[in-house]
Amino acid sequence: RICVAYEGMERFFPADKIILTGNPVRPSLTQNLISRDEAARKMGLNPAKKIVLIIGGSLGARSLNESVMSSLALIRASKDIQFVWQTGKFYIEEMKRRLAESETVNNLFPTDFLQDMDIAYAASDLVISRAGAGTISELSLLGKAVILVPSPNVAEDHQTKNAMALAIKDAAVHIPDSKVSKELFPAAIAIVNDVSRLTLLRENILRLGIHDSAVIIAREVLALAGHPIRTNSLSNIKSVYFIGVGCIVIS
């Protein structure tokens, strides 16, 4: 069996082996949610202004970082938008040095790492992100408008498949990595200033979120192992271990 996070995966996998489960996310992300304005204040941002969150993973994404640097004039001119920029720990010193050598950009806030992603997500009006399955599952459950820039450095280009699965449903905007330098920030600024577009993206991605993914997958594993669970409770199961890369495949 092949557990997938969204519909339309029969284009890439045998249809008779697919089961729609979603991807499990850490419970803390969807528990004790706070309002956008409260989250913005916790981050030291102005709730009255739009917020764009740029995340390239804990290590960072070179192309996203370079796109920020090449778009400084456009970012600087967008005074009513705040840009929270997670550079990744490998890039923070370089990016800060290059920013210091440039004209001041008061609405750009670089950081190497965001400890409280639940707060960062809550504060953001638009997210710019790679297209990993885990991140997409988080964004779907939270209903966040997102521009997905798939990493080209992954097995079988699976992030592009992830992004396409959402883009075809108008649940995300897909920009290839090769086009980010010219297209990313003009698109981001246009989208975050378009209330109807933001709303549509939020509503469509929220429909794709599956809240009980862990339970669905655990049931499938146990059924294949000859231990089907016929009740709604999995409290008698002590441990289920998953080992996977990119997606969950049960053979």
Regions found by a protein language model. Name each.
Residues 173-179, 191-195:
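Conserved acidic donor-binding segment of nucleotide-sugar-dependent glycosyltransferases
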Residues 1-40:
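Active-site-proximal region of nucleotide-activated glycan assembly enzymes
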Residues 34-127, 160-163, 168, 175-185:
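Donor-nucleotide binding loops and adjacent catalytic segments primarily
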Residues 41, 197-211:
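A short, well-ordered alpha-helix in the C-terminal region of glycosyltransferases
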